[in-house]
Amino acid sequence: RATFTPEEVCTLVTEFYRRNYIEGLFLSSAVCKNPAHTMELMYRTLHLLRNRYRFNGYIHVKAIPGAPVELIEKTGYLADRMSVNLELPTGEGLQKLAPQKTQKAILKPMRQIQSGIVDYRLTAGKSAFLERSSGNRYLSHSIFDTRKQISASAADLGWISSSSARSLPEKERSAPFVPAGQSTQMIIGATKENDYQLLSTSQLLYQQYDLKRVFYSAYIPVNEDSALPSRE
């Protein structure tokens, strides 16, 4: 398994950026040692890019389920977008193919990121909800309708406590928090959900977590396992 140090990632990104090869960075990682260690490395990478290398390009970073809330919060003040992979459309599918993971553990950082976005937007005098494209605003009964109302207190949404939010310096907390919103991705075809289940999950994510995008990734068989669909 290949790994890069935060300094190596920063060097690559800044060199590519100077040559106009890239406009931004998508930073993701498998779990290295444990979620806390992995998230710490990702935070250090973003902190170096923004502060030492003065990188002002777009950054999308994955949040690692199980990582400390403080690390996810600090990372959110350095990233443009964050995402947490839902992995599979239903909890039953996740339990079948990845029993070491739980949907609750995946949704926890997703809710925390949503709370931080709401807190920042309300402080900045904006609507709690992310803006949608103009076409979506005029569609009746769209997938974005009947979203749960969010109060002015991000702590009311749960998962992230007001004490952890106050742990950051005032200057850092006043910065934009994940201004481009959060997204997720789920694998389609590895489990037997029907279209109604897939769209219901997407609707729930848009309405209850105010995601900017739900992405779908087609299942591609790599390993042989009786729990996985046949290659035929």
Regions found by a protein language model. Name each.
Residues 1-181, 188-191, 205-206, 220-230:
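Conserved Radical SAM active-site core
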Residues 186, 193-196, 200:
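Ordered, small/hydrophobic-rich secondary-structure cores
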Residues 200-219, 231-232:
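Helix-loop elements that line ligand-binding/catalytic pockets
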